[in-house]
Amino acid sequence: MLQRTLAKSIGVTGVGLHSGERVALTLHPAPENSGISFRRTDLDGEMGEQIKLNPYLINDTRLSSTIVTDKGLRVGTIEHIMSALSAYGIDNALIELNAPEIPIMDGSSLPFIYLLQDAGVVDQKAQKRFLKILKPVEIKEAGKWVRFTPYDGFKVTLTIEFDHPVFNRSPPTFEIDFAGKSYIGEIARARTFGFMHEVEMMRAHNLGLGGNLNNAIVIGDTDVLNPEGLRYPDEFVRHKILDAIGDLYIVGHPIVGAFEGYKSGHAVNNALLRAVLADETAYEWVEFADSDDLPDAFHELNIRNCG
């Protein structure tokens, strides 16, 4: 299977979830083996240079997965666009933006999916590299855990737990094996969510200024405040899977393995990536030059053409 990039550059404007400021974002094609990179067009000099993404650049996970370089450059809320790039198997792309965070759009990855469909996807000459999990690796932290286990494909299983009546009406666990299920159909539409009392507290600290009922599920004392309700009966846990897929794709390659999590979040997801990369016996890099050898979970990537 070959590496791929965008067929053409494409842009979109939106609002930053935390800043509330308008953000112009452009995705560009990039050369093979260059990976996913970001560039802040609103900054000059070294701060305006291109940054190649890797798990060690995620140094702020309090509210999202945020790049923070040693020079203090920030690019926040990257998980939704990374999730969409993962769904289309984009290996190489340059993402330019004129603000410190990716626009929130509608709170899901679906607008970025549409953007990729409009841009189109092209194969490149180099073989796509996969990160294959060879043994179980687990991170436990303050009542939550995540783990990788070997698996001939890509499967994600997550469980959430919140002490709130809304969550008692929603299944807490969701599992998706991409050998038989579609990311676009099952995951892409799931929106980020938050509690009304948290929104008020965040705004008091100049955070969440761009959040509203058009780009997040807002939960009141007893119910969801969005008049249209939920897009899936279990939209909450599906969004956590959307986030996890984006967080894991920060490694820059598709993962051959199973990911499980209980009350997972950006911090433990990133810690798990780092733990795998720190143990050379836990993984290997593989290629599938013969499509017959490609695990079923990636067959949809092999035939999908956005153009």
UniProtKB/Swiss-Prot annotation:
Gene3D superfamilies: lpxc deacetylase, domain 1, lpxc deacetylase, domain 2. GO terms for cellular component: membrane. InterPro entries: Ribosomal_Su5_D2-typ_SF, UDP-acyl_GlcNac_deAcase, UDP-acyl_GlcNac_deAcase_C, UDP-acyl_N-AcGlcN_deAcase_N. Zn(2+) binds at H80, H239, D243. Keywords: Hydrolase, Lipid A biosynthesis, Lipid biosynthesis, Lipid metabolism, Metal-binding, Zinc. GO terms for biological process: lipid A biosynthetic process. Its cofactor is Zn(2+). Pathway: Glycolipid biosynthesis; lipid IV(A) biosynthesis; lipid IV(A) from (3R)-3-hydroxytetradecanoyl-[acyl-carrier-protein] and UDP-N-acetyl-alpha-D-glucosamine: step 2/6. Catalyzes the hydrolysis of UDP-3-O-myristoyl-N-acetylglucosamine to form UDP-3-O-myristoylglucosamine and acetate, the committed step in lipid A biosynthesis. This is UDP-3-O-acyl-N-acetylglucosamine deacetylase. It comes from Neisseria gonorrhoeae (strain ATCC 700825 / FA 1090).
